[in-house]
Amino acid sequence: MSKVLAIDTSTSRTSVAIIDGDTVVFSGFRDGATAHGPSLPALVQESLAVSEVDEGVVGMGPGPFTGLRVGIAFAQSFALARQIPVRGVCSLDAIAAQINEKDFIITVDARRKEVYWARYTDGVRVGEPAVNFPADVSGASIHADLFVDLQALVRLPGNITDPIYLRRPDAIATADRP
């Protein structure tokens, strides 16, 4: 069984864990929407003091542009340097794994008074994640203010190769401005 480094920066929480089968060898997090950059290396360093890893898994969003880039770039660089595989998983799916209902919706803060969301039936995502105003998201029980379950992130199949950005970044390159 491989030891997996799990990373998620798709919410305001920077989360890191080392999972060995069903055992959580290390788990740590730091809260703060702008803390991903300084928090992630410190958490990974702390985790590696406990155990080495054979694989990486990273939450691919949806989430804020910069937060996602920090987590994904770190996971890919770490895996490349260690010559281990890394795979990407939809972060909303790893949140949904905590809910035991027939039909439900997972929402996370997208800032700008919006939410990233996805609908689930029997724990399986129905359709693609989206971004809307909270008032526009309805039709099932809504679960908000939850964070990614890193054990679920590791258990889920991961074949996502591109970050799940649901809107363009705020910054626009000078050359691309009208």
Briefly describe each language-model feature range.
Residues V44, A75, L92:
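Generic structural marker for isolated residues within well-ordered, non-membrane alpha-helices
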Residues L43-E55:
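Phosphate/pyrophosphate-binding loops at sites that engage ATP/ADP/AMP, CoA/4′-phosphopantetheine
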Residues P38-P41, I72:
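Conserved active-site region of classical short-chain dehydrogenase/reductase
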